[in-house]
Amino acid sequence: MADIKNYTLNFGPQHPAAHGVLRLVLELDGEVIQRADPHIGLLHRATEKLAEQKTWIQSVPYMDRLDYVSMMVNEHAYVMAIERLLGLEVPVRAQYIRVMFDEITRLLNHLMWIGSHALDVGAMAVFLYAFREREDMFDMYEAVSGARMHAAYYRPGGVYRDLPDTMPQYRASKVHNERAIKAMNEARSGSLLDFIEDFTNRFPKYVDEYETLLTDNRIWKQRLVDIGVVSPERALQMGFTGPMLRGSGIAWDLRKKQPYEVYDKLDFDVPVGVGGDCYARYLVRVEEMRQSNRIIKQCVDWLRRNPGPVITENHKVAPPSRVDMKSNMEELIHHFKLFTEGIHVPEGEAYAAVEHPKGEFGIYAISDGANKPYRLKIRAPGFAHLAALDEMAKGHMIADAVTIIGTQDIVFGEIDR
């Protein structure tokens, strides 16, 4: 009698559920996965090496392109590492703006995740709903930075500029008539803070809509419950962070455990899952959206009442105002040297980590006193999660591999770097 032999299947990299360029080599016994071997590197762009050739500030746009659905949070870790090397004090208003945009970015990420995860599993409506809300948040990005995705808004010592008093307006087109445009621009008639406040008042209702579609849906539960179970002990051993760790029942969140910026002054809860399966991680992320909305509301309230500077007064790090530059020779020299040479960061090393939507995103920067990093190491949260795919998928069906990839919320910009 011939030996029963497992067969091998290539999953991706051209696959709609591969979330970019994931190639999985699956060893199957019938339709049951015996081994899953992730092949990475197809989106490798040598970001760490590129940063060594650029001045400290020129690498800020590279950060946006790591996890390209959580743009500003990537920038935050990078500028925090520079600030620690420089010993810079960031103005409190800039800290609140950063925290507010970190949480807006968390919503952007989680909406992309819930839409694509549901689409992978077979529910299409949520994907369309999620993009409706993302559109408003892209408008917030555009208002402060001029870009809808890759903002490059954070700077060492603060942010690029203060919050604007006007919002970008829609114009009539072939797609929308004037009546529709008027309705769309109604919430955009005031300042950015007015628009964000209006959005935070509407957003809880949208999260309820997603939950109505998914949470008690029996097909959704059949596809997620008891799939990709990870115990708390294994989650710690494998280096899980973020919703992947909290879904296994461990209440670890850098915003609470190692507070940075003004998170210690804000009131929010850390959602923790029970069971460590895909469904628990789904519930954690849905509740995280509600908590992020709470944080944004508190930031809006504080920012309305407290005007002030949004970037450091140290002109060796941040450019002087254009008015000063054109009337003061010393400020002109600062401006010229800053944009030709860049910042000279003192010798030393620093690690800065933020609670990224996907987990702990860290930047380890080493300076030799020059105007560019000697070495930059990026700690991508998705890397540890993807390494656990073999263990999470073993014994499950091929269709469940799609669910497990979705629950990990993988983006290859940060994994391949």
From Swiss-Prot:
The keyword Cell membrane applies. It is found in: Cell inner membrane. It is a peripheral membrane protein. PROSITE patterns: COMPLEX1_49K. One of its GO terms (molecular function) is quinone binding. Keywords: Cell inner membrane, Cell membrane, Membrane, NAD, Quinone, Translocase, Transport, Ubiquinone. GO terms for cellular component: plasma membrane. It catalyses: a quinone + NADH + 5 H(+)(in) = a quinol + NAD(+) + 4 H(+)(out). Belongs to the complex I 49 kDa subunit family. NDH-1 is composed of 14 different subunits. Subunits NuoB, C, D, E, F, and G constitute the peripheral sector of the complex. This is NADH-quinone oxidoreductase subunit D. It comes from Cupriavidus taiwanensis (strain DSM 17343 / BCRC 17206 / CCUG 44338 / CIP 107171 / LMG 19424 / R1). The gene is nuoD.
